[in-house]
């Protein structure tokens, strides 16, 4: 639902709008696009123009949750690892890493360098595969108890 115009969007349209206009940080040049959906009041098809600003406001809650999760994780990170992260930065992977402006947003909230992994859509799978290959070397790290 596009709340300012009470427009109901289909799943595919929502995904298209997200890919075209979503950002976690203000862009140098804001963009606009026509969006077609169903008017919630009349039930009739309707076309509205929306912007990256409106879409950014619409996704603010999940983006803030991502930023909060990163900060909580950093707060719970052992000091030695935190120092390494401060030096090397945060590496984003997965589909969310492709959200425009997410590195800038996380840098602004953490003060740390933030980068997107090469080929972020496959980085998680590749890293999981590498972990399985190196399991004997990594098992003590992977299964260290928080209660030690």
Can you say where each PLM-predicted feature lies in the sequence?
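Adenine-nucleotide phosphate-binding core of ATP-dependent small-molecule kinases
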Residues: 29, 33-82, 121-124
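Interdomain boundary/hinge elements
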Residues: 6-12, 118-120, 142-144
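Short, small-residue-biased leader/transition segments that mark boundaries at the very start
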Residues: 2-3, 67
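Conserved phosphate-binding/catalytic loops in two-lobed NTP-binding clefts
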Residues: 104-130, 138, 145-146
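Long, charge-dense, solvent-exposed interaction surfaces that engage phosphate-rich ligands
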Residues: 8-44
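Glycine-rich phosphate-binding loops at beta-strand->alpha-helix junctions
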Residues: 22, 26, 82-106
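Residue-level signature of catalytic and energy-coupling elements of molecular machines
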Residues: 17, 70, 92, 128
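Flexible, glycine/charged-enriched surface loops at secondary-structure junctions
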Residues: 7-14, 76-85
